[in-house]
């Protein structure tokens, strides 16, 4: 048997290859790889072609699929290439890695960190190694640069330099650089220095030194940056020859970009030497920053990229290129389109310290506009790091825990991608961070730069957490560089630069370069030389691949589809494949391909195939097998290859063609298996007589044998296998069972090592294999270790017997006890057993009985009594019983004082008409008190109520008045509680408006500001911008009850500002903005016009606007239009026009003219000429078609897009159901796929649906369909008739009504005599009655378009003959019987009979005909079906006898032993192999038929037979049997006496206090007398206890239950006990009186109070839905049934809704209102005079400490900053202004609530000076504009501009701008005559600039 190649698994595959290792001599080197395969491959390591063996220094660790080579104490001789070779039956694979061993570095302190010592000559073989790498440098232009490197290796490598991937001679001429080889005395290895003479700006870049030898290639790189010196020396005129550089575009072009988008400018410059590039903006040099990137792309172009363009970025950008041969310019004008929807306040740049925070803030036009935050292109989501806040229109981003990577550009974006941009600068040790990500092509150089704050610091470079080699790193001063030359995929990852706790990270991404795979080998040939080998030869691919490659050889067994890898070959040539390389014998084909790092070539298949046979070797031979009697014996061996073999047993060959075999009938059974290389022989259930058998195995080249030895199996324990631990309670039955492997084998029981003795309390039984030890009623002393021991083996049982656990019946919940001193307190606990011990604990310490503590035990009740309590007796008590605890909390109140609450003086502040409640709590409920006010006893009245409730006394003032203020006392004996009540008028509140109001009005519009107060007589004051207003004609103040108004009859722009309506305790704010009149469209008046024009033609849209200078925008179909030759925009005075000189139909649409406030719409409709039908001079003639033919109607219109309407006979035509409508340009087509009569008529094509539109008509005529003969289908039909019978010929036509003629032998027939012609619709019939021989002939049915011929013959019927007779059959009962007989002719009529009766088809009878055969099948024959079967055909007949044999009635499922209890019903059941007749089986007992008994019944259900015994008795037990004629089965019925059982047990009952509980159970027997008990105490009938018994049912009813009645209720009868738990719950607590709304003044105490229905209950207080917990400011108190919540020192945060809850009851919510405390100014501000640059301090003292103040200067709010410091010291508020400026002078205001204080700040200005000068010379192009800009020492200073001494005035030519301290002069449309000297004078200071103009 040959295994197919699909069964060989998978060849080895390397998931991870070993990587080259470079170590220092004496260190440890380790190579690792991961290889998979099926079966798992064998891995060996080789070096120099020799397999390596493990030694002291060399080991091969392996962990699953991971294999390694570990080399300790590496020596130079260990260097070289190590090969990992993996091989299995499916193929082979290998991988190699080089190990380089270097000498340890010399301890030379002068060596640089990047230098490495040269390896010794004996160890230098291998790839080159850089000993010293080049260092990155930052130099000034003109300096000399030297880059050196030194590499080692044998043979000595060749060194060469590259710049930015290009050879040096391709970049420079030879005069600019020099290469200096190193000298031997400089050190070992090859050295090459690159010297650059007079470095230029283009010399900046990455320089890579390559080292290459025969063993490999290495490279090291460095960065060179050349900077412009601060002052460049003047150029030498001799070095300025004619320019040879030409720009790509000479004239500047225009570039538009939307705000927030990127703008990219690219300039491509050629020249030699390489030109220097400078970028300028508006005449000023540009330096790279966060938003301006300057770089050179891969194509050599110079790129300037402006990120996130803003309006300030617009202007002229110039790319200037120069070299020693000349210079050139290229310019572009950048325009930034601003969005219509803009941020009202954009973001501002911010700075922050590392680990600090940064806040970015902007404003959107509308608070409902959604925004999103970005860091460059990364969306920021709200988190702890990025906190995002939205307050109205303000959007704020707070960046927490700043780090270096947070430095960058941040954006806030709203809908429409409208953005505002800001820079976030993070100050820290790292000044210039890494970019977020860096994309580099594979093979290019990657450079990363970092600038640090301090020079000379050492940073750390790492990638994915691993430090990078030192040779890649360089640093100089503040700069740190990482240069990775020729990056590969392995270099990708997260690169981090760390400096202390600061770090910056970038994601380095390497984009792979696509490479072409190598070509395939050529000239592949196969030679079948030696026996069992094949020689394969080939040639290398052409052209040869540039990268290293190998050849992969694969094989395929003929007939299989799978190719399996054989070898991997490094060099071309030949390879010999021996037979040992294949897994099994067969014909094999081979193919080969080339594999490199860039892919795999196509396969080349060797022509032909070779027959290979593997040689088998014995890997693991047979071994003697020794087993126990009855076990399976397994013999196995492993071969080296897959091959068939033969097994022998005692010299007799065993056959392997069946899954299981036997040596001979009844002898040993065996099974032969082969899985891959393993062969197995399994002998099943060997017997003792098989001992000594000899097993042998034989195959080509291998023979082996082994012996079989059988031992008698020892006894062992089947269960339990491990030690068993069992736990029981006392009186419980204990059964320990041990099962042995042998039947009736003796065993001995031991307890705690002592042999046990049987008694009434300990019974030992043996039942077959099982041994049992029984303890009928376990006791505690029965606990111990039990052992069942037999012949050296034992089973152990750990038995623990313990008393049942103790349970606490009452109380089940925590009990709270409140008492006063000297009272007696009793704590009671009930357990479920009277003898159960308990322990009492107080505050964790066990209680001991004494005179002050009494412990009592009474039955199940346990009590702790405190006879005379003291305050120290309070605490937490516990009653511990077993594992359960009952908890009691005792609180003792000291009554040394009558008044419990309040303990001190109470101050109550209220407003008029408020409800005031004064509460005093006493220690005794019966004590009487006396209330006084200001020393006089009060008298109860409707205005003053006195209340008494338990221990609480209250004085209530329902509606307090001002005269109710005073001191109230609650007196009892010598004690009193004092309450000071202060009543004030309620503060004035502004009812409307509650929020700030913003009003926008236009000039001359009437503005009304209204404020509604809570009181009509409350005075108010109006303020505008902080100053109180005065009534005048332009400002009117009105008052109407509580409504106050401020009216501006004709508002002016200067009337805008902030208005305040101040009512003392409250204020309303109004922001008024008065704008210029809106820009409106005054003509035409309609806002939407429909205008009709002819096309082509002139279209002019005109409108008038006001004011005349209003700007408008034109839109078409929603898109803004731009002026062009085809669309002209005009503006003349107030008129605005849009003109289309040559309008086309596509110019139709919606045109909108829009001002800032209004818009008008013009719906332009361009009418086209009417549509006409073309190329039809005459009316189309009618079209006649046959049915089923296609019809195509077409016409051509004068315009392609014109719609048409098709109609048929006046009705519109719908596409579908065989109709298709097409439009092909101007052509319109209607297609009828298959014409029918319904398609005939008049078709009309009309252009459009309008009445009277042009139309074209077509007439279609469809001919009637011909009448065809449908049946019969054959053209000629033969019909046979018998003499005397009727002849009937029938024809069916395709349609009714067709004329048909009948002919016989050419003569026409008519309906007469015996011939009748009939027609019924499409059915035509010819009937000839009493056919005769003369009626035979040819009959023709002739229809108009079709005909049919009938060939009629009249013949006598043929004689029926029996070709074969029936044969007798004998079948078994239930089988089928089939009778078969052949008759002639085949269509003769036959009749079947059984026992003389005609047989008809049915479920059990089938009749069939197959040609001349007649078949009768009788299904499921029964004994009664036996008899004679007859077939009658005409006058002949044949008969056969059917015999049915009875089938043996055997039992498939036999009787089983049954155990039953007296009185139960028992069913005995058997299943027979077939359904027997009634009485086929009989039931017996003890071998005798069953007696007649009403309790016995028998039933049969198909195969199932049952015997029912109802209500078994002890006499029924015995042996029962079921018998048939062929089989018998017996079973034993055992009956045990009836036991008392619980049919329905007791159930737990839970009720409320005072209710009744009913317990009920049902027993298995009647008349049982039992006892009821609760908590172990027997119950007797009484008023609260009712006991009932009714047959099987027993019931207990308990009434009037209390909490103490909870416990265990049980019923006991004989040995039966059933119990359930009674749980009595307290009545739910309710809230009798809930809290009320409160209003307090800020800083006062607020008290909420509620009252419960019970004193012992826990209340939960909540604020705004959140639970409250006690704190120093929040107290929760319980006073009897009252619960108090006190809030001390209330603040605004305490305001809100409060509620209380107890259980499911809730009260509230109620509201707490905290009034703001009035603040007054105690110490006013003082005016300050200072000089510019000095500081000023303002102080103000207010009456309250916790007051927030606001500072303003000149009406502007002040916030802390660099020049503003604000602090608070108690009541004192301080403002410190530093570095004062002249514009800081103004009014200083401090405001704290309604209180404010004013002072003046006077600043003496210093003389105006120049701070920043314009350049001495400025060059501009003709036609552009020039901008000169200066900065003076302060804002607001006046400057004067002069040209050649003459003062310049603003105009079209000169524009003068001022922004803060910056002043600009803009010269428009510069001309040559504008060249000259310009001067700017500021005070006594001045500056000059020479303006140069270039160009024609």
UniProtKB/Swiss-Prot annotation:
Q: Describe the function of this protein.
A: Core component of the 3M complex, a complex required to regulate microtubule dynamics and genome integrity. It is unclear how the 3M complex regulates microtubules, it could act by controlling the level of a microtubule stabilizer. Acts as a regulator of the Cul7-RING(FBXW8) ubiquitin-protein ligase, playing a critical role in the ubiquitin ligase pathway that regulates Golgi morphogenesis and dendrite patterning in brain. Required to localize CUL7 to the Golgi apparatus in neurons.
Q: In which tissues is it expressed?
A: Widely expressed, with predominant levels found in the heart.
Locate the Ig-like domain: which residues? 12-100, 128-225, 243-330, 339-425, 714-800, 804-893, 902-982, 986-1075, 1078-1172, 1174-1261, 1265-1357, 1357-1534, 1628-1720, 1794-1896
Per the database record, which ranges form the Fibronectin type-III domain?
Answer: 517-615
Name recorded for this polypeptide = Obscurin-like protein 1
PROSITE patterns, per database record: FN3, IG_LIKE
Cysteine disulfide partners in this protein: 33-84, 149-209, 267-319, 362-412, 738-788, 829-879, 920-970, 1011-1061, 1103-1153, 1195-1245, 1381-1522, 1650-1700
One Gene Ontology CC term in the entry? cytoplasm
The organism of origin for this protein: Homo sapiens (Human)
Q: Region entry Disordered: which residue ranges?
A: 106-127
Q: What results from changing residue 17 to R?
A: Diminishes binding affinity for TTN
Q: Does the keyword Thylakoid apply?
A: no
Task: Give the matching InterPro entries.
Answer: FN3_dom, FN3_sf, Ig-like_dom, Ig-like_dom_sf, Ig-like_fold, Ig_I-set, Ig_sub, Ig_sub2
Disease (UniProt): 3M syndrome 2: An autosomal recessive disorder characterized by severe pre- and postnatal growth retardation, facial dysmorphism, large head circumference, and normal intelligence and endocrine function. Skeletal changes include long slender tubular bones and tall vertebral bodies.
- Positions of region (Interaction with TTN): 17-19, 85-94
Residues bearing the modification Phosphoserine? 10
């Amino acid at each position: 048997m040959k295994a197919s190649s699909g069964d060989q698994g998978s060849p080895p595959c390397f998931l991870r290859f070993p990587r080259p290792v470079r170590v220092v001599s004496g260190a440890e080197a380790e190579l690792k790889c991961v290889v998979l395969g099926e079966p798992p491959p064998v891995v060996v390591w080789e070096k120099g072609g020799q397999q390596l063996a493990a030694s002291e220094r060399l080991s091969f660790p392996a962990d699953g699929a991971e294999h390694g080579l570990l080399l300790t104490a590496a020596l130079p001789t260990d260097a070289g290439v190590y090969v990992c070779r993996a091989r299995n039956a499916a193929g082979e694979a290998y991988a190699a890695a080089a190990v380089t061993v270097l000498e340890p570095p010399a301890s030379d302190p002068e060596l640089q960190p990047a230098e490495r010592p040269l390896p010794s000559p004996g160890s230098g073989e291998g790839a080159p190694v850089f000993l010293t790498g080049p260092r990155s440098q930052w130099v000034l232009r003109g300096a000399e640069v030297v880059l050196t490197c030194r590499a080692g290796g044998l043979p000595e490598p060749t060194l060469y330099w590259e710049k930015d991937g290009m050879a040096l001679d391709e970049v420079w001429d030879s005069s600019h650089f020099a290469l200096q080889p190193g000298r031997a005395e400089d050190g070992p290895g090859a050295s090459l220095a690159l010297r650059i003479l007079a470095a230029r700006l283009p010399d900046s870049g990455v320089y890579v030194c390559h080292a290459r030898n025969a063993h490999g290639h290495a490279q090291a790189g460095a960065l060179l940056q050349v900077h412009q010196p601060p002052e460049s020396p003047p150029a030498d005129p001799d070095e300025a020859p004619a320019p040879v550089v030409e720009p790509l575009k000479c004239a500047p072009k225009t570039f538009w970009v939307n705000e927030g988008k990127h703008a990219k400018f690219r300039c491509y410059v050629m020249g030699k030497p390489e030109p220097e590039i400078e970028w300028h903006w508006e005449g000023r040099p540009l330096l790279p920053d966060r938003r301006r990137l300057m770089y050179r792309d891969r194509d050599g172009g110079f790129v300037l990229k402006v990120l996130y363009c803003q309006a300030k970025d617009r202007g002229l950008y110039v790319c200037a290129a120069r070299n020693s041969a000349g210079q050139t310019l290229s310019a572009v004008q950048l325009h930034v389109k601003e969005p219509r929807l803009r941020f009202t306040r954009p973001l501002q740049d911010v700075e922050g310290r590392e680990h600090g925070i940064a806040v970015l803030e902007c404003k959107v036009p509308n608070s409902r506009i959604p925004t999103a935050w970005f860091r460059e292109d990364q969306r920021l989501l709200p988190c702890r790091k990025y906190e995002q806040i939205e307050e109205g229109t303000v959007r704020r981003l707070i960046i927490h825990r700043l780090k270096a990577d947070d430095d960058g550009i941040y954006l806030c974006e709203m809908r429409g991608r409208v953005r505002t941009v800001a820079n976030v600068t993070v100050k820290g040790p790292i000044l210039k961070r890494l970019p977020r990500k860096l994309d580099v092509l594979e093979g290019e150089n990657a450079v990363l730069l970092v600038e640090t704050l301090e020079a000379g610091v050492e940073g750390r470079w790492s990638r994915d957490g691993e430090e990078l080699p030192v040779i890649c790193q360089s640093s100089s001063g503040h700069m740190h560089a990482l240069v990775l030359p020729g990056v590969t995929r392995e270099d990708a990852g997260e690169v981090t630069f760390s400096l202390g706790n600061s770090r910056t990270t970038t994601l380095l991404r390497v984009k792979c370069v696509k490479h072409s795979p190598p070509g395939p080998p050529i000239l592949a040939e196969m030679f079948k030389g030696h026996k069992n080998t094949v020689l394969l030869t080939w040639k290398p691919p052409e052209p040869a691949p540039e990268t290293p490659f190998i050849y992969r050889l694969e094989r395929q067994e003929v007939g299989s589809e799978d190719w399996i890898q054989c070898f991997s070959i490094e060099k071309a040539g030949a390879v010999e494949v021996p037979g040992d390389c294949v897994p099994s014998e067969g014909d094999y084909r081979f193919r080969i391909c080339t594999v490199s790092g860039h892919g795999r070539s196509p396969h080349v298949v060797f022509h032909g195939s070779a027959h290979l046979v593997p040689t088998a070797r014995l890997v693991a031979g047979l071994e003697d097998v020794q087993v126990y009697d009855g076990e399976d014996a397994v013999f196995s061996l492993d071969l080296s290859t897959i091959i068939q073999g033969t097994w022998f047993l005692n010299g007799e060959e065993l056959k392997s063609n069946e899954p299981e075999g036997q040596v001979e009938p009844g002898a040993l059974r065996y099974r032969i298996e082969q899985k891959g290389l393993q062969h197995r022989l399994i002998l099943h259930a060997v017997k003792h007589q098989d001992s000594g058998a000899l097993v042998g195995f034989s195959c080509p080249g291998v023979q082996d044998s082994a012996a079989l030895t059988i031992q008698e199996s020892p006894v062992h324990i089947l269960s339990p296998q491990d030690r068993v631990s069992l736990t029981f309670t006392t009186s419980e039955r204990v059964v320990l069972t041990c099962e042995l492997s042998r039947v009736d084998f003796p065993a001995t029981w031991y307890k705690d090592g002592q042999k046990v003795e049987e008694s009434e309390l300990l019974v030992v039984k043996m039942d077959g294999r099982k041994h049992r030890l029984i303890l009928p009623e376990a006791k505690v002393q029965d606990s111990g270790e039990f052992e069942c021991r037999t012949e050296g083996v034992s089973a152990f049982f750990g038995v623990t017997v313990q008393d049942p656990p103790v349970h606490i019946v009452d109380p089940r919940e925590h009990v709270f006890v409140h008492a006063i001193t000297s009272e007696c307190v009793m704590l009671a606990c009930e357990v479920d057993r009277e003898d159960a011990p308990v322990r009492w604990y107080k505050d964790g310490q066990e209680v001991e009985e004494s005179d002050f503590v009494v412990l009592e035990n009474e039955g199940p009740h346990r009590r702790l009594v405190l006879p005379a309590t003291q305050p120290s007796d309070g605490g937490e008590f516990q009653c511990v019983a077993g594992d359960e605890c009952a908890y009691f909390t005792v609180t003792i109140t000291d009554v040394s004082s009558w008044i419990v609450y309040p303990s001190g003086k109470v101050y109550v502040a209220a407003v008029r008409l408020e409800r005031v409640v004064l509460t005093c709590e006493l220690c005794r409920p019966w004590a009487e008190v006396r209330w006084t006010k200001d020393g006089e006893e009060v008298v109860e009245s409707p205005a003053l109520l006195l209340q008494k409730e338990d221990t609480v006394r209250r004085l209530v003032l329902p509606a307090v008045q001002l005269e109710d203020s005073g001191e109230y006392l609650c007196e009892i004996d010598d004690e009193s509680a004092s309450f000071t009540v202060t009543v004030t008028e309620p503060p004035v509140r502004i009812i409307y408006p509650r929020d700030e109001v913003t009003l926008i009005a236009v000039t001359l519009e009437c503005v009304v500001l209204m404020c509604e107060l809570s009181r009509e007589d409350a005075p108010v004051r109006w303020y505008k911008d902080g100053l109180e207003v005065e009534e005048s004609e332009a400002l009117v103040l009105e008052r109407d009850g509580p409504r106050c108004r401020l009216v501006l009859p004709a508002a002016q722009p200067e009337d805008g500002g902030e208005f305040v309506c101040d009512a003392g305790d409250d204020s309303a704010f109004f922001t008024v903005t008065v704008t210029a009149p809106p820009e409106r469209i005054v003509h035409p008046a309609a806002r939407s016009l429909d205008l009709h024009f002819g096309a082509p033609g002139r279209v002019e849209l005109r409108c008038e606007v006001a004011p005349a200078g209003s700007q408008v925008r034109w839109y078409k179909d929603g898109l803004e239009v731009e002026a062009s030759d085809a669309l002209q925009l005009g503006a003349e005075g107030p008129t605005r026009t849009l003109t289309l000189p040559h309008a086309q139909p596509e110019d139709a649409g919606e045109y909108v003219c829009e001002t800032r406030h209004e818009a008008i719409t013009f719906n332009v409709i361009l009418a086209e000429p009417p549509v006409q039908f073309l190329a039809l001079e005459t009316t189309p003639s009618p079209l006649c078609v046959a049915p089923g033919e296609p019809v195509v109607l077409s016409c051509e219109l004068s315009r392609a897009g014109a719609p048409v309407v098709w109609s048929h006979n006046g009705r519109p035509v719908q596409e579908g159901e065989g109709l298709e409508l097409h439009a092909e340009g101007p052509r319109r087509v209607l297609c009828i796929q298959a014409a029918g009569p319904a398609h005939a008529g008049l078709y009309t094509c009309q252009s459009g649906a309008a009445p009277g539109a042009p139309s074209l008509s077509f007439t279609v005529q469809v001919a009637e369909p011909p009448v065809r003969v449908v049946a019969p289908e054959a053209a000629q039909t033969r019909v046979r008739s018998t003499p005397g019978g009727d002849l009937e010929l029938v024809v069916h036509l395709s349609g009714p009504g067709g004329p048909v003629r009948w002919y016989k032998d050419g003569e026409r027939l008519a309906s007469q005599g015996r011939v009748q012609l009939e027609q019924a619709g499409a059915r035509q019939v010819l009937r000839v009655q009493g056919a005769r021989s003369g009626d035979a002939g040819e009959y023709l049915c002739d229809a108009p378009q079709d005909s049919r011929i009938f060939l009629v013959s009249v013949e006598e019927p043929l004689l029926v003959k029996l070709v074969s007779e029936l044969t007798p059959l004998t079948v078994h009962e239930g089988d089928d019987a089939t009778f078969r007989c052949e008759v002639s002719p085949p269509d003769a009529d036959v009749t079947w009979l059984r026992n003389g009766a005609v047989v008809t088809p049915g479920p059990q009878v089938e009749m069939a005909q197959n040609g001349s055969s007649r078949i009768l099948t009788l299904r499921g024959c029964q004994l009664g079906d036996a008899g004679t079967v007859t077939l009658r055909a005409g006058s002949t007949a044949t008969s056969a006898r059917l015999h049915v044999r009875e089938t043996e009635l055997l039992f498939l499922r036999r009787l089983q032993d049954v155990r039953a209890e007296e009185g139960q019903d028992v069913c005995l059941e058997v299943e027979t192999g077939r359904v027997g007749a009634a009485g086929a089986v009989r039931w017996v007992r003890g071998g005798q038929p069953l007696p007649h008994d009403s309790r016995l019944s028998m039933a049969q259900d198909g195969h199932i037979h049952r015997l029912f015994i109802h209500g078994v008795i002890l006499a029924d037990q015995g042996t029962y049997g079921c018998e048939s004629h062929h089989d018998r089965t017996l079973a034993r019925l055992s009956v045990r006496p009836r036991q008392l059982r619980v049919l329905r047990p007791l159930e737990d009952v839970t009720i409320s206090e005072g209710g009744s509980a009913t317990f009920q159970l049902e027993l298995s027997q009647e008349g049982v007398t039992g006892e009821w008990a609760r908590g172990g105490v027997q119950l007797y009938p009484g008023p609260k206890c009712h006991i009932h018994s009714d047959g099987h049912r027993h019931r207990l009813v308990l009434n009037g239950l209390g909490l103490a009645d909870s416990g265990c209720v049980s019923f006991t009868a004989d040995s039966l006990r059933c119990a359930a738990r009674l749980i009595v719950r307290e009545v739910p607590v309710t809230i009798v009186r809930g809290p009320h709304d409160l209003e307090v003044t800020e800083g006062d105490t607020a008290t909420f109070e509620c009252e419960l229905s019970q004193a012992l209950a826990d209340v939960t207080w909540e604020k705004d839905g959140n639970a409250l917990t006690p704190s120093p400011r929040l107290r929760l108190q319980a006073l009897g049934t009252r619960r108090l919540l006190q809030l001390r020192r209330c603040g605004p945060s305490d305001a809100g809704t409060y509620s209380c809850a107890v259980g499911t009851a809730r009260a509230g919510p109620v509201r707490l209102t905290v009034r703001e405390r009035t603040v007054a100014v105690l110490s006013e501000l003082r005016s300050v005079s200072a000089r510019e640059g000095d500081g000023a301090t303002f102080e103000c003292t207010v009456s309250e400490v916790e007051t927030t103040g606001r500072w303003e200067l000149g009406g502007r709010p002040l916030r802390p900053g660099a020049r503003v410091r604000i602090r608070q010291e108690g009541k004192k508020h301080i403002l410190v202004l530093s570095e004062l400026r002249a514009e800081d002078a103004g009014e200083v205001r401090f405001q704290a609530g309604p209180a404010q204080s004013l002072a003046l700040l006077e600043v003496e200005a210093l003389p105006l000076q120049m701070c920043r000068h314009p350049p001495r010379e400025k060059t501009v192009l003709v036609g552009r504009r020039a901008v000169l800009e200066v900065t003076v020492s302060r804002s607001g200073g006046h400057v004067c501009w002069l040209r050649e001494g003459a003062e310049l005035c603003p105009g079209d030519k000169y524009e003068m701008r001022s922004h803060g301290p910056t002043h600009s002069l803009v010269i428009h449309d510069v001309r040559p005559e504008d060249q000259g000297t310009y001067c700017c004078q500021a005070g006594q200071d001045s500056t000059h600039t020479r303006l140069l103009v270039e160009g024609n």
